[in-house]
Amino acid sequence: MKYLTTASGTPVSTTTFGTMQFGGNADAHQSHAMFDAARNAGITHFDTAVGYTEGASETLLGQFIKPERDAIYLATKVGYVGGASRANMTAHFDQCRKQLDQDNVDLLYLHRFDDDTDLEETFTTFADFQQRGLIRHIGVSNFAAWQIMKAQSIAQKLGTCIDVIQPMYSLVKRQAEVEIFQVAQDQDIQIIPYSPLGGGLLTGKYARGETGRLTDDSRYNARYNQTWMHDTARNLAVLGADIATDPATLAVAWVAAHPAKPSPIISGRSTIQLAPSLAAENYTMSTDLYDTITALSLSPPPATDRLEEA
């Protein structure tokens, strides 16, 4: 498995901090406090996107990393809106660099697959950014396994490759186990999964009657509204209480403990909310505990759907 390094050659942290809340649910003061907490916990990998909080996320992150840029692995994303054409990617990336106040970034993702743009145009653009020293690594987010392989074959013909993928993955969203993780291992691609807490479901707060994205955002409610998912969250909270460990810590550490060695993206609205996820950075999960947690949710069927041979 490929391991990423900062520009100074230091391996990046095994946990990534996502800044989607910066400048939105977290104001500048709260955002800076979370950034400092992440750095104090040893996190060096920070993830953002051109459109997060209408650009405020990149602007704040750019300010925070400036005093120690060489120690930070900086990732951002383009193409969630407007597609993966050269013109749109270039316009977005120019906007990224302006908002971040950076000439270059370590990792640039295409935020999602674009059915309407030839992948050769997309990856010719990526390769050009690399050759000009504007990016070090290439990533794709929200791609299916076949899309990753098709893109990888084109990238390799252009003399480059996909270095990182960013799929959704958590105890209640395990589809990535079916083919995406295997593709990544086969192609030596680093896995940086998002939403290890299942939109906050796995913190246990919804079982306590609290509110959050699942109650406030119809997209998240639709994503995590199945009864078995809520049962899994309740059972994880019970397990956490039994072993005196916050369920959020267990959820993030479980993702990181997968044999494919993913590096989960954590986030929060405040340092208090962030703390249990940060604790996973140094949490050692035994094989027995990993298996116990795995059994709390439904395993996806194999790609062949031959369950008797799984």
Which residues does each PLM region occupy?
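N-terminal binding-site loop/beta-alpha segment at the start of enzyme catalytic domains
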Residues: 1-72
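Beta/alpha (TIM)-barrel catalytic core signal, keyed to glycine-rich beta->alpha loops juxtaposed to Asp/Glu
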Residues: 3, 119-296, 300, 307-310
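Acidic (Asp/Glu)-rich catalytic clusters
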Residues: 7, 40, 62-70, 94-101, ...
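Hydrophobic faces of well-ordered beta-strands that scaffold small-molecule active sites
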Residues: 13-18, 46-48, 74-76, 105-110, ...
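Active-site beta-loop-alpha junctions enriched in small/polar residues
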Residues: 20-22, 49-51, 77-81, 110-113, ...
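Short, acidic/polar
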Residues: 26-38, 85-100, 123-124, 148-152
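Structural motif corresponding to the early beta-alpha repeats
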Residues: 67, 71-87, 111-112
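Active-site groove signature of glycoside hydrolases
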Residues: 97-116
